[in-house]
Design a protein with these regions (language model features):
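Substrate-binding surface in catalytic domains of secreted glycosidases
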Residues: 1-117
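Active-site rim elements
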Residues: 52-57, 143-150, 171-175
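Flexible, active-site-adjacent loop/turn segments at secondary-structure boundaries
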Residues: 29-31, 47, 84, 137-139, ...
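Hydrophobic, secondary-structure "cap" segments at the distal end of domains
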Residues: 109-166
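Soluble or luminal CAZymes and related metallo-dependent hydrolases
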Residues: 57-64, 147-154, 180
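Acidic/aromatic/glycine-rich contiguous surface patches that form carbohydrate-binding/processing clefts
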Residues: 88-89, 150-191
Length: 191
């Protein structure tokens, strides 16, 4: 098995059609499409299933990566869609559209590094939730900080996509980011 990129700039040079014969399955790391390296760009979804309204046509998202792998000859039943048990954040975000697609001035503090927090930490903050049905993405916004992360609902939508498209399953990064009651892992199992 391998953990493989979901961004076209990273999977583009790989001979996907040639390598899959040596692999039982491929874990597509379908997260980190946006993050702290874009501190002064738009607050955006870091693990969207479908194209974000903030993105231009050249952007990456989960379903686009799956399509690219299958078009390159990788059997769909060898692909696992990755979901994050952490979120990416932006600070200095205007209070418009619950922060989505708004220009940021930086990245907020995180437990390990700026702009990244575990689901457990973000869920415990109790901020107002927002949902983007088109991208199957969850986020929170407190008036100046925007955090994009998968929750039970987004994992359920991604599981529906996996089942509906014949993928092998879901994988996640990283178990310690889950809430103490294991709700994200339980959501994966029940999906």
């Amino acid at each position: 098995t391998i953990a493989a990129p979901a961004g076209a700039a990273h999977y583009g040079p790989i001979q996907l059609g040639a390598i899959h014969g040596s692999l039982d399955w491929i874990n597509i790391m379908a997260y980190d499409f946006h993050g702290s390296w874009e501190a002064t760009k738009k607050a955006n979804h870091h693990a969207p299933l479908h194209q974000s309204p903030c993105d231009d046509a050249g952007a990456d998202w989960s379903a686009k990566a799956i399509t690219a792998y299958t078009r390159a000859g990788v059997p769909v039943n060898k692909l696992l869609l990755g979901v994050p048990f952490y979120g990416r954040g932006w600070s200095g975000v205007p209070a418009v559209n619950s922060g989505l697609c708004q220009a940021a001035t930086g990245v907020p503090r995180g437990v390990y590094e700026r702009g990244i927090n575990d689901y457990e930490v973000l869920d415990a903050q109790g901020r107002p939730d927002s949902w983007d049905d088109a991208t199957a993405t969850h986020w929170t916004f407190n008036g100046s900080e925007f955090w994009s992360y998968d929750d039970e609902r987004s994992i359920g939508k991604k599981a529906d996509y996996v089942k509906g498209n014949g993928l092998r399953g879901l994988m996640f990064w990283e178990l310690s980011g889950d809430a103490p009651d294991g709700r994200l892992l339980r959501s994966l199992r029940q999906s």
